[in-house]
Amino acid sequence: MKISRLGEAPDYRFSLANERTFLAWIRTALGFLAAGVGLDQLAPDFATPVIRELLALLLCLFSGGLAMYGYLRWLRNEKAMRLKEDLPYTNSLLIISLILMVVAVIVMGLVLYAG
């Protein structure tokens, strides 16, 4: 079933705010994708090739996951608004924050190791 046929249309302000939030997730995903590609292509002396490629792959995979998460979150919020339900709570933000923290620690370790 198409989302536009579900329930009744929410106030446009809320629907557009939901869309802006989705686009923010996409921008963030594109940033991680650019970081992964940049690390692989523009930093050949950063750590060992295996570690550099593994970290670049991790950043690119995280980018794809964020893009999908952004869409699924948009969809859940849109359904909830159309059905006049409470917006769903998510624990995923904690998981995303922890993954980002791990990547940051790895990068800091590699920078200190390479320097």
Curated annotation (Swiss-Prot):
This protein's UniProt keywords: Cell inner membrane, Cell membrane, Membrane, Transmembrane, Transmembrane helix
Stretches in topological domain Periplasmic: 52-53, 114-115
Pfam families attached to this UniProt entry: DUF202
Gene Ontology biological-process annotations: response to oxidative stress
Record topological domains on the Cytoplasmic side: 1-30, 75-92
Tagged with keyword Phosphoprotein: no
Membrane topology: Multi-pass membrane protein
UniProt-annotated location(s): Cell inner membrane
Highest taxon in the source lineage: Bacteria
GO CC aspect terms: plasma membrane
Transmembrane annotation, as ranges: 31-51, 54-74, 93-113
Family: To M.tuberculosis Rv2272.
UniProt name for this protein: Inner membrane protein YidH
